[in-house]
Regions:
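N-terminal glycine-/charge-rich "phosphate-binding" loop or analogous flexible N-terminal tail
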Residues: 1-38, 143
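NAD(P)-binding Rossmann-fold cofactor-contacting core
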Residues: 10, 137-154
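Phosphate/diphosphate ligand-binding glycine-rich loop within oxidoreductases
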Residues: 40-111
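Rossmann-like adenosine-cofactor binding region
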Residues: 49-50, 149-233
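A short helix->loop->beta-strand "cap" motif at the edges of active sites that frequently abuts
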Residues: 56-60, 80-82, 140, 194-196, ...
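Glycine-rich adenosine-cofactor-binding loop
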Residues: 96, 115-136
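Oxidoreductase and adenylate-handling cofactor-binding alpha/beta cores
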Residues: 96-110, 137-140, 238, 257-266
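Rossmann-like dinucleotide-binding domain for NAD(H)/NADP(H)
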Residues: 195, 201-331
C-alpha cells in the first residue's frame, strides 16, 4: 500500500510507515503524476482533490486534516468509490480562542463591555456553538443563525437578515458551499448596523471581501478570498488580519492528525484506531470569566502582534501559515 501525506501535517511522521510505503510532499506537489500509484492521500486545503488530481489513479481513500472539505470534489469521489474523511470539530477550541482574542481587542478598543454588544453567530456547529456559549457567559447578547439546524430542529434561530439588522458584531462559522458563498454580500452589508464588525474565521469565500472593503464596516479576517495571494487593499483595511491560523492550536492539530489516522486505520484495517500524538496535553474545558480572559489571553496569544506581522509580510502568507508556532489551548 502506498500513502501520500502532506509534509506540513504535524505529528504524523513515522506512524504509518510500519504498514505502508509513505511519501511526504508539499501540498502543491501532490499532482496527478505523484498520486497515480497511491492508494491513499492525507492532505490539507492546499491540495485540490478532483478529476484533475485523481483521474487514472489508484486512490481509493482521501483524508483531509481540516474541518471543511470544500477543496474536495465530493461528487467525483462518490461516483468513483473513493472514501473521503475530514476532521470536523478538531480545532473548535482553537478557533474559539482566536475569536475570544478578537472580541477582547474590539471591546477594549471601543472602551466598552460585552453587555454593550449584540453578537450574531452565523453557523452554530462545532465552533459556532462554543462561541455562542462563551459569549453569553461573558455578557454579550447572542443571536444565532443556522438555517440547516433550524430546518432540522426548529428552535430560536434568526435569519441572516435579522442578524444583519440587529447585531453589532457578526462572527461567521459556516462551511463554504453554494448556499454560503458571498453570504456576506453588498446587499446584506447595506442592511447592517452602522459601523458593525464582521469576523470571519470560516472560509474566505463566505464574505465578498471587496464589498466589505468599500463599506464603512470593521472586519477581522483569518480567511481570505484568493489566499494565499491576498488583495493588498483588503489586507490593509482589516482591523485584525491573520494567515488562516485561527484553529492552529497544539491540541487542534493533534486532533486533526489523529482523526485522519483513525479513518485510515478503519478503512485499511490497521492497528492504529487508538493512536494519539505522544506528549500532547489535553486541557480540561472550562468557562472563564471576561475578566480572566482579558487578563490572561495576551500572554497566550498576542493577536495584534500577529496581525501586524501579516500586514508587514503579506507576500509570506504561506510561509507564516506553514511555519506557525501552534498555540496551547487553555480553556
Amino acid at each position: 500500500m502506498k500513502v501520500i501525506i502532506d509534509s506540513a501535517i504535524p505529528y504524523i511522521r513515522g506512524i504509518v510507515e510500519p504498514y505502508a510505503d509513505v511519501a511526504y510532499m508539499a501540498g502543491a506537489e501532490i499532482t496527478n503524476d505523484a498520486v497515480r500509484y497511491a492508494d491513499a492521500l492525507i492532505i490539507r486545503t492546499r491540495t485540490k482533490v478532483d478529476a484533475t488530481l485523481l483521474e487514472n489513479s489508484n486512490v481509493k481513500f482521501v483524508a483531509t486534516a481540516t474541518i471543511g472539505s470544500d477543496h474536495i470534489d465530493l461528487e467525483y469521489c462518490k461516483r468513483h468509490g473513493i472514501k473521503v474523511c475530514s476532521a470536523p470539530g478538531c480545532n473548535a477550541r482553537g478557533v474559539l480562542q482566536w475569536v475570544a482574542a478578537t472580541l477582547r481587542h474590539l471591546v477594549i478598543k471601543d472602551c466598552c463591555t460585552p453587555q454593550d454588544y449584540t453578537l450574531g453567530v452565523v453557523g452554530v456547529g462545532n465552533v459556532g456553538s462554543l462561541v455562542a456559549q462563551y459569549a453569553r457567559h461573558w455578557g454579550f447578547r447572542v443571536m444565532e443563525c443556522d438555517p440547516p439546524r433550524q430546518e432540522r430542529e426548529g428552535g430560536d434561530f434568526h435569519t441572516i437578515e435579522e442578524i444583519a439588522k440587529e447585531c453589532d458584531i457578526i462572527t461567521l462559522h459556516t462551511p463554504l458551499d453554494t448556499t454560503t458563498r458571498h453570504l456576506i454580500s453588498s446587499t446584506l452589508i447595506e442592511m447592517m448596523r452602522p459601523k458593525a464588525t464582521i469576523i470571519n474565521a470560516s472560509r474566505g469565500g463566505v464574505v465578498d471581501n471587496r464589498a466589505v472593503l468599500h463599506s464603512d464596516h470593521r472586519y477581522a479576517f483569518d480567511v481570505w478570498e484568493g489566499e494565499p495571494d491576498l488583495d493588498p487593499d483588503v489586507l490593509a483595511g482589516a482591523e485584525i488580519a491573520t494567515p488562516h491560523i485561527a484553529g492552529y492550536s497544539v491540541q487542534g492539530k493533534a486532533n486533526a492528525t489523529a482523526m485522519c489516522i483513525h479513518a485510515l486505520a478503519k478503512f485499511f484495517n490497521l492497528p492504529l484506531m487508538k493512536w494519539y500524538p505522544d506528549g500532547i496535553t489535553r486541557p480540561t474545558p472550562r468557562l472563564i470569566s471576561w475578566q480572566e480572559l482579558c487578563q490572561t489571553i495576551p500572554s497566550h496569544y498576542d493577536i495584534s502582534a500577529e496581525s501586524n506581522e501579516l500586514k508587514t509580510l503579506a507576500s509570506e502568507f504561506e510561509a507564516l501559515r506553514n511555519n506557525y508556532a501552534y498555540r496551547e489551548e487553555y480553556f
